From Swiss-Prot:
Cofactor(s) needed for function: Zn(2+)
NCBIfam families in alphabetical order: rRNA maturation RNase YbeY
Binding note for cofactor: Binds 1 zinc ion.
Localization, UniProt: Cytoplasm
Keyword Isomerase: no
Protein name: Endoribonuclease YbeY
Its EC number(s): 3.1.-.-
Binding site for Zn(2+): 125, 129, 135
GO molecular function, one term: zinc ion binding
Class of this enzyme: hydrolase
Highest taxon above the source species: Bacteria
GO biological process: one example: rRNA processing
Amino acid sequence: MDLEIFDDTNSVPAEKIQLVKDVLEFSGKYLELPEDTEMSVTLMNNEQIHEINLKYRGVDKATDVISFAIEEDDPDELPIILPDDVDFEEPKNIGDMMISMDKVKEQAEYLGHSEDRELGFLTVHGFLHLNGYDHMKAEDEKVMFKLQRDILDAYGLKR
């Protein structure tokens, strides 16, 4: 996977950033995504994610993770036309994810598990949203949460 990870807090330890990268690469392989799949992750604080949550979702509070999936087949987007002899496939950018590192700490403490487990959980949760999974309906929630648990267990971040 082609990952861009940004630390907007300027304080996330390198090993936490590496954990996000490793979990995403593992998750991408688990879902059998193409190697050239692209996405970005921004690690931020509660104040920063609160602003984004309010601006884009109309929710006036901090949250733990927000995912913005890139919609495929945008009818307003013009196709790229290449000569017939050029073999080119554009990498698939699945979108952007934001994680509140403050929420990672708060929720790990509240749930009684490690910050690594919480960070891994939020990373997989947001990643699945970017890949079209959601939990708006009970049946969809069942599918998403099972897959989430399976990925985390296979990676070794069990509860």
